[in-house]
Amino acid sequence: MNQTLAAQFLTRDQVTNFVVHEGNGVKGLSETGIKVLPDQYIQPFEERLINFHVKEDSDESIPVIDISNLDEKSVSKAVCDAAEEWGFFQVINHGVSMEVLENMKTATHRFFGLPVEEKRKFSREKSLSTNVRFGTSFSPHAEKALEWKDYLSLFFVSEAEASQLWPDSCRSETLEYMNETKPLVKKLLRFLGENLNVKELDKTKESFFMGSTRINLNYYPICPNPELTVGVGRHSDVSSLTILLQDEIGGLHVRSLTTGRWVHVPPISGSLVINIGDAMQIMSNGRYKSVEHRVLANGSYNRISVPIFVSPKPESVIGPLLEVIENGEKPVYKDILYTDYVKHFFRKAHDGKKTIDFANI
C-alpha cells in the first residue's frame, strides 16, 4: 500500500494536494515510504545548514540555569545576562514536574497519531475557530520551499473555550502544561523586568509581557534526504518569551550572537528551553535579543516539540518601555500595534530576523 501511494506522486501539484489540501501533512507523506524528497521541500542551497558554520561540540552552547538556586540575585543575573548575550537559555529545576512534561509529549504523539479525518477537523477549512489550527509547514501560500513539519496551534482564550474547541486527545495535558509553566514565566519576566527598571509586574505590564498565550504541538516526521530541507527555517519568534519543551531527539540550532555560528541545543531531560522574542527585544529597546534559530529535519527519527509563545495582547501598542528610555536613552523602535506585527510575520515565509525591521524607526 505504501509503495503504491509513494508511486502516485508524479507532480508537484499531487504532492501539495496530498499534504496540504487533503490534510495528510508531511507525516502522511513520510508514512507512504517515499525515498526521495519532493521538489517543493528542497531548500535553496544557501538555506541548508551544511552551508553554515555549525558547532555541535558541547563546549559551546546556550547557558543552562538552575532556577531552584536559593540565591535569587545570582539567578536573576544569569537570566538577564543570557537574554542579552544569547537570547536563549535552558532552565532546570524549574518547578514543572517531569510527569506533566512527559504527559505533554505523550499527548502530542497521540494527537498526531489520530486518523487524518480527525486531524482535518481542525484544519483551516474545517476548524470551528481561528484559535485552533492544524496545518503543515509555516505559510505554504508564501513559501518557495516548504518546511518538513506538521503542527497543531492553539490560541488560549479561556478554559471554557478550550473545553469546547481543543482536541480531546490532548486538551487536558496541554492545559495542565500551560498552567504549570505560569509561575516560571512570571518569575522570568520579573527578573527581566527588574533589570529594565520595571519595579512591579502589575496588570498593565502583564498585558504587555504576557497578555496572550499560544501553544503549538509540532511534529517532525522521518525525512528522506534531510540534508536538503529544514524542519523550521531561520527565524526569530514574535513573542515576549517562548518556553520550549523538546524531546530527546534534538535538532534545534541557534545562531550565536558573538560568533555567528549555528550552535546545537542539546536536549536535557526535564529541562525547558527559553528564548527571547521580538516583542521583548522591542520593549527592552534592543537590550534583550531575539535570536535566529532553526530546526533540522531528521532521517532516522520522528521528533516532537511543544513551544508556548507568551506575548502581548493582540490589541496592545508596544514600543520601548518608558522605564528603559526615561533617562535619555534613544528609542530604536517605534510604537506598533502588536497584531499588525504578528500579521506581518505570518504573511511571509521565514526570513531570519527581517520581521523586526517592521518596528524600526
Swiss-Prot record:
This entry's Enzyme Commission designation comes to 1.14.11.61
Give the cofactor note. Answer: Binds 1 Fe(2+) ion per subunit.
The chain positions of domain Fe2OG dioxygenase read 211-312
Keywords, ordered alphabetically: Dioxygenase, Iron, Metal-binding, Oxidoreductase
The entry's note on the tissues where this protein occurs is: Low expression in roots.
Q: InterPro entries of this UniProt entry?
A: DIOX_N (IPR026992), IPNS-like_FE2OG_OXY (IPR044861), IPNS-like_sf (IPR027443), Oxoglu/Fe-dep_dioxygenase_dom (IPR005123), Plant_2OG-oxidoreductases (IPR050295)
Phenotype caused by lack of the gene: No effect on scopoletin and scopolin levels in the roots.
| Residues the entry annotates as binding 2-oxoglutarate | Y220, R303, S305
Question: In terms of domain of life, where is this protein from?
Answer: Eukaryota
- Quote the record's note on pH dependence: Optimum pH is 6.5.
Listed cofactors: L-ascorbate; Fe(2+)
Example of a GO MF term? metal ion binding
Q: Where does Fe cation bind?
A: H235, D237, H293
Against Gene3D superfamilies, the record matches this protein to: B-lactam Antibiotic, Isopenicillin N Synthase, Chain (2.60.120.330)
How is this protein induced?
Not induced by 2,4-D treatment.
Catalytically driven reaction(s): (E)-feruloyl-CoA + 2-oxoglutarate + O2 = (E)-6-hydroxyferuloyl-CoA + succinate + CO2; (E)-6-hydroxyferuloyl-CoA = scopoletin + CoA
Q: Which PROSITE patterns match?
A: FE2OG_OXY (PS51471)
Q: What class of enzyme is it?
A: oxidoreductase
Question: What is the purpose of this protein?
Answer: 2-oxoglutarate (OG)- and Fe(II)-dependent dioxygenase (2OGD)involved in scopoletin biosynthesis. Converts feruloyl CoA into 6'-hydroxyferuloyl CoA but has no activity with ferulic acid, feruloylquinic acid, caffeic acid, caffeoyl CoA, p-coumaric acid, cinnamic acid, cinnamoyl CoA or benzoyl CoA.
Family matches, as PANTHER family = OXOGLUTARATE/IRON-DEPENDENT DIOXYGENASE
Q: Which family does it belong to?
A: Belongs to the iron/ascorbate-dependent oxidoreductase family.
Q: What is this protein called?
A: Feruloyl CoA ortho-hydroxylase 2
Organism in which the protein naturally occurs: Arabidopsis thaliana
Q: Which gene encodes it?
A: F6'H2
